[in-house]
Amino acid sequence: ALVFLLAGVGLGLATAMGWLSGFVRLAHLHVLLAGWICITIMGAMTQFVPVWSAVSLHSRRLATAQLWLVAGGLAAFVAALLTLNFALLAAAGSVMLVGFWLFVYNIFRTLPPLTEFDITEAHFALALGFFLLATGLGLLLAIDFTTGMLFEWGFNRLAVVGSHATLAVFGAVMTTVVGALYQLATMFTQTDLHRSDPLLQRFESVVYPAGVAALAAGRLLENPVLARLGGLAVVAGVLAVGFIVARKLLETQVDWTPMLSRYAVVTVMIGAWGALTARAWLVDPLAADSLLAAPGAVHLLAFGVVGFVVLGTLYHIVPFIIWVHRYSDLLGYEPVPMIDDLYSDRLAAVDFGCLLGGLLGGLLGVFAGVYFDGPTLLLAAGGALVILGALLFTANMLLVVRRHSPHTLVGILGVPGDHERGEDDPSPAVDQE
């Protein structure tokens, strides 16, 4: 996932500078969303659904296979987009589809019975359904490049693209994000639910999934009324979640952490995205330039909301997994570090500043270009800060693995063989920063 993050940032720069040919923007979007975001979601669900639900993972072999199928398929898919090799595009898309569907099957078999679902598990189950629909439409779009079958079936290709993007971003990704935030925001602020919170959660649990389905169907069928109703429901559901998380952050009972700092950015970006996008979707929910947000505001959602949720969550997930495997058995027998001691606070602070500055600079640059035909200096500066922040974040996570994991990086990736650290490997001691 970290490799795809860096590749996505690089492709974003190449898109802005015009360095590559082919479908560069499409490759950029798929590397970040299908690569960095979705592979992170796959790993997080595989690791934490068994913990949250107090069950055993259905199959670790499937978990390893799905990673390589999605990662390998996506690498070939991106190469096909850049070289305009449409035959390879369909083949690579098929490999990705198998990987995603293995993931859906594995997690669905891991989840408890439907009657025992809590709100997080219910959102995860819905997200799995959206994964099936989004990837299925995605493969049809890849095949359509060489067959033109969508036209023969009476569908507008751009309408199918809009439905696919809606199911992928608002269905698969955002439904997962919402479900995780309900669990994580409560857990890591050590706060209780207000009397209004269950009402907001029930409102969102009905309105948001129905809105995603209506927006996707409205775009597929080119029905503006259905799409408009669905879009407004999506905005209302996301704003409800943002309100709950913002209140928990204000009432937090714990010291501020990199995770909470990034979640704070998320709540602000949700408000800004909702205000701009509601108006755009009221006017025209089928417009190509307002597919995920108002014109010029797509990064509010993609980076400001989804990206910062993933970044903040990884600041807990990666150290937590390493801590469990390396130190949990030593607890009570010898001094062990806290989870937040495993990463560098200094790097975390600097990467946060770079990424936030890059986001704000990029947004101002995009808005200047869209609405005022302004210069691209802000956009270039923002992009440079994002690249630096992504590199620092990746370095911080890799240092956690290098210094503290009982396994080598090769072993963590699931390559067969003995990849335990030997006695000559660096000791995973506590950082002294």
Task: Write out the residue ranges for each language-model feature.
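Hydrophobic alpha-helical transmembrane segments of multi-pass integral membrane proteins
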Residues: 1-433
